[in-house]
Amino acid sequence: NTFINLTEDLSGGVKLELYDPFLPSSCIIDRFPVKDVNIPTNEFMVKILDAIDAYLEVGHVPYIHCWGGIGRTGTAVGCWLIRHGHATPATVIDLLDELRLGDIEAGYRPSPETPYQLEFILDWELGK
Protein backbone atom coordinates (compact mmCIF):
# COMPACT_ATOMS: atom_id res chain seq x y z
CA ASN A 1 0.00 0.00 0.00
CA THR A 2 3.07 2.27 -0.16
CA PHE A 3 5.20 3.00 -3.20
CA ILE A 4 8.79 4.20 -2.87
CA ASN A 5 9.31 5.64 -6.35
CA LEU A 6 12.99 6.09 -7.26
CA THR A 7 12.34 7.33 -10.81
CA GLU A 8 12.92 10.90 -11.87
CA ASP A 9 10.68 13.51 -13.53
CA LEU A 10 7.14 12.18 -13.94
CA SER A 11 5.35 10.83 -10.90
CA GLY A 12 5.03 7.50 -12.69
CA GLY A 13 8.57 7.71 -14.02
CA VAL A 14 10.13 8.50 -17.36
CA LYS A 15 8.85 6.08 -20.02
CA LEU A 16 6.71 4.53 -17.33
CA GLU A 17 2.98 4.98 -17.67
CA LEU A 18 1.48 7.05 -14.90
CA TYR A 19 0.03 4.72 -12.32
CA ASP A 20 -1.00 7.33 -9.77
CA PRO A 21 -4.56 7.78 -11.14
CA PHE A 22 -5.23 4.03 -10.91
CA LEU A 23 -4.28 3.57 -7.27
CA PRO A 24 -6.78 3.65 -4.42
CA SER A 25 -6.68 6.82 -2.37
CA SER A 26 -5.34 4.77 0.55
CA CYS A 27 -2.06 4.17 -1.32
CA ILE A 28 0.91 6.38 -0.58
CA ILE A 29 3.45 7.36 -3.22
CA ASP A 30 6.69 8.67 -1.78
CA ARG A 31 9.17 9.94 -4.38
CA PHE A 32 12.93 9.89 -4.04
CA PRO A 33 14.19 10.69 -7.55
CA VAL A 34 17.57 9.19 -8.42
CA LYS A 35 18.99 9.63 -11.92
CA ASP A 36 18.78 6.41 -13.96
CA VAL A 37 21.82 4.07 -13.76
CA ASN A 38 23.21 6.31 -11.03
CA ILE A 39 23.59 6.38 -7.26
CA PRO A 40 22.26 8.80 -4.66
CA THR A 41 24.43 10.53 -2.12
CA ASN A 42 24.90 8.71 1.17
CA GLU A 43 22.64 11.28 2.84
CA PHE A 44 19.89 10.77 0.27
CA MET A 45 20.10 6.98 0.63
CA VAL A 46 19.70 7.37 4.39
CA LYS A 47 16.47 9.33 3.70
CA ILE A 48 15.21 6.54 1.43
CA LEU A 49 16.02 3.86 4.00
CA ASP A 50 14.50 5.92 6.83
CA ALA A 51 11.27 6.22 4.82
CA ILE A 52 11.16 2.46 4.20
CA ASP A 53 11.71 1.82 7.92
CA ALA A 54 9.05 4.36 8.93
CA TYR A 55 6.46 2.74 6.66
CA LEU A 56 7.32 -0.75 7.90
CA GLU A 57 7.06 0.43 11.51
CA VAL A 58 3.42 1.47 11.03
CA GLY A 59 2.48 -1.72 9.19
CA HIS A 60 2.70 -0.52 5.59
CA VAL A 61 4.12 -2.73 2.87
CA PRO A 62 6.54 -0.61 0.82
CA TYR A 63 7.00 -1.45 -2.85
CA ILE A 64 10.35 -0.02 -3.93
CA HIS A 65 10.76 0.60 -7.64
CA CYS A 66 12.65 2.40 -10.35
CA TRP A 67 12.07 2.03 -14.08
CA GLY A 68 13.48 -1.47 -14.59
CA GLY A 69 13.62 -2.61 -10.97
CA ILE A 70 17.28 -3.54 -11.22
CA GLY A 71 19.72 -0.69 -10.64
CA ARG A 72 18.30 1.92 -8.30
CA THR A 73 15.90 -0.55 -6.71
CA GLY A 74 18.64 -3.13 -6.15
CA THR A 75 20.89 -0.45 -4.69
CA ALA A 76 18.25 0.69 -2.19
CA VAL A 77 17.20 -2.84 -1.22
CA GLY A 78 20.82 -3.96 -0.89
CA CYS A 79 21.62 -1.04 1.42
CA TRP A 80 18.47 -1.75 3.47
CA LEU A 81 19.45 -5.42 3.87
CA ILE A 82 22.90 -4.44 5.11
CA ARG A 83 21.51 -1.70 7.36
CA HIS A 84 19.41 -4.24 9.23
CA GLY A 85 21.92 -7.08 9.31
CA HIS A 86 19.97 -9.31 6.90
CA ALA A 87 23.09 -9.40 4.73
CA THR A 88 26.71 -8.34 4.82
CA PRO A 89 28.72 -6.82 1.99
CA ALA A 90 30.01 -10.36 1.37
CA THR A 91 26.51 -11.91 1.09
CA VAL A 92 24.25 -9.12 -0.16
CA ILE A 93 24.59 -9.75 -3.91
CA ASP A 94 23.78 -13.45 -3.53
CA LEU A 95 20.73 -12.53 -1.44
CA LEU A 96 19.57 -9.96 -4.01
CA ASP A 97 19.93 -12.61 -6.73
CA GLU A 98 17.90 -15.06 -4.64
CA LEU A 99 15.16 -12.51 -3.95
CA ARG A 100 14.87 -11.74 -7.67
CA LEU A 101 14.41 -15.35 -8.82
CA GLY A 102 10.67 -14.82 -9.28
CA ASP A 103 11.18 -11.97 -11.77
CA ILE A 104 10.44 -13.78 -15.03
CA GLU A 105 11.32 -10.82 -17.26
CA ALA A 106 14.52 -9.55 -15.64
CA GLY A 107 15.49 -12.03 -12.92
CA TYR A 108 18.46 -13.16 -14.99
CA ARG A 109 19.99 -9.65 -15.04
CA PRO A 110 22.43 -8.73 -12.28
CA SER A 111 21.25 -6.29 -9.65
CA PRO A 112 22.50 -3.71 -9.06
CA GLU A 113 23.07 -2.67 -12.63
CA THR A 114 26.34 -0.71 -12.67
CA PRO A 115 29.77 -1.03 -11.03
CA TYR A 116 29.08 2.26 -9.20
CA GLN A 117 25.87 0.88 -7.71
CA LEU A 118 27.63 -2.33 -6.69
CA GLU A 119 30.45 -0.39 -5.03
CA PHE A 120 27.88 1.81 -3.25
CA ILE A 121 26.17 -1.24 -1.72
CA LEU A 122 29.42 -2.95 -0.78
CA ASP A 123 30.54 0.20 1.06
CA TRP A 124 27.27 0.40 3.05
CA GLU A 125 27.47 -0.38 6.76
CA LEU A 126 25.30 -2.08 9.34
CA GLY A 127 23.06 0.49 11.02
CA LYS A 128 23.83 3.30 8.55
Each model region followed by its residue ranges:
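A phosphate-binding catalytic loop at a beta-strand-loop-alpha-helix junction
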Residues: 59-78
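Walker A/P-loop NTP-binding motif
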Residues: 78-84
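C-terminal domain-closing interface element
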Residues: 119-128
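Generic alpha-helical structural context detector
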Residues: 78, 94, 122-123
